[in-house]
Curated annotation (Swiss-Prot):
Pfam families: Glycos_transf_2. Pathway: Cell surface structure biogenesis; S-layer biogenesis. GO terms for cellular component: plasma membrane. Involved in the assembly of a N-linked pentasaccharide that decorates the S-layer glycoprotein and flagellins. Catalyzes the addition to the dolichol phosphate carrier of the hexuronic acid found at position 3 of the pentasaccharide. It is an enzyme of class 2 (transferase). Disruption phenotype: Mutants contain only mono- and disaccharide-modified phosphodolichols and exhibit defective or limited motility. This is Glycosyltransferase AglI. GO terms for biological process: S-layer organization. The gene is aglI.
Amino acid sequence: MADSPFPCVSVIVPVYNDPTGIRDTLTALTKQTYPTERVNILPIDNGSTDETRDVIRQFEREHENVTLVVEDEIQGSYAARNTGIEQATGEIFAFVDADMYMDESWLETAVDAMDEAAYVGCDIELVTNGEDTLPARFDAQTAFPIAQYIRQQQYAPTCGLLVSREVVDDVGPFDERLVSGGDSEFGSRVANAGYRQAFAPAATLYHPVRDSFSSLVKKELRVGRGLCQRQEYYADRFGRPGIPPRPSGVKSPDEESSGLDFERLLFGVLSVVMTGVRALGYYREYVRYVRGNTR
């Protein structure tokens, strides 16, 4: 996609109150085999109130291609990513989250895939951090079927996405109003504009599982809100608000799990509960939408 075998890449990493996560991610990013002079790493601090910014500054002092960027005005990952886009100098934007890590060849492998498409989703594997809890095992079963997302829903999650500057200049950045689902909304714009989307199975990123009930609930509430918001803002593409989210199916533990029958029962119950939590998030947002349209 460029004359140089190594196009300039801007790696954009939104972060909020996660010093450990951003340290792990920046450590992995600064060890990439991709030529250092062709990469600028942009951790975007989204108003952290802990030592997150201090951790980033330490990397900034030690690595000339790491630059701290601050987004204090709007709290939200899509606003942070858009600020990163504004500050980026690369021909390619690579998006990862601030609790992920990757092998040293990840960026080189991912950029190679850009020869075939202007929008590339990376492989994402969920990993445990030593906590063998029911929520961790449950979350691990969700996985990230990126190839299916791209083929059927025309998007890749922003925690593992590469996209050319040309595409963003054409279709616009992320919608900062969305609390979730901005990756889906952006991906549909890219597809509608006629750009090819591809999956890079060899470009693997590692994402920690959610290992507590509270983290699962927080995620599902946010996803439910995002479903309704996409319908509110983009009814032509996502339908009108008021249609509840459909259950994604009962998850089952893998065949290697001990106590399989009992665990399958627990997974089934938890699947139903989390679908209900997602619906709760959806209808909370729907009530806000209705009230806003009846004033």
